[in-house]
Amino acid sequence: MNQTAYRRPTSALPNVIFALLVANGLVFALQQMNAKFMFINFALWPATHPQSPFAFWQLLTYGFLHGNMTHIIFNMFGLWMFGRDLENVMGSRRFLIYYLVCVVGAGIVQLVVAAFQGGIYPTVGASGGVFGILLAYGLTFPNRIVVPLFPPIPMRAITFVFIFGLLELYLGVSGGAPGVANFAHLGGMLFGFVLLRYWRRGRRR
């Protein structure tokens, strides 16, 4: 993909983006009805946790649960803001595959980190998928100008991605953001990068 391949979207809310927004909203509503059941069964639990061992489906389902209203609002805003143009470039099917691979990849990285750190707390949130989308956005539209919420300074999309990646790495290593799965965010970006490279190599053959 490159910036010249970009087509102005016919809709501000493409099919997969719409479906993901609805799915996340419905799951969040279910959490309000029975949070304990949802978290025990569908959050991503480290294998070291004594009461809720890892189940394979959690690598996907954790990405549809959120800790609170602020958590889901920011993730869904990022999904819509950066994902809508990508879906129009990639096509709905490939975009969905990419997003889900980033979610699962972020979960795998988080499990590895939790195993080394002895973590026992669950992980929830679409952030791994959103960070993967952010990476793809920066690589697809590198020269597009974006304005972060903080700091509100206009910058190139690729610069924004680079700064965010470094910030996540710093926070993950330093422990400066307790309760935030920084390495899961990086995992989403890593798996997204690998998948994009794989697809690009496939087109060259």
Please report, for each region that a protein language model flagged, where it lies by residue.
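A detector for small-residue-rich transmembrane helices and their helix-helix packing motifs
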Residues: 1-205
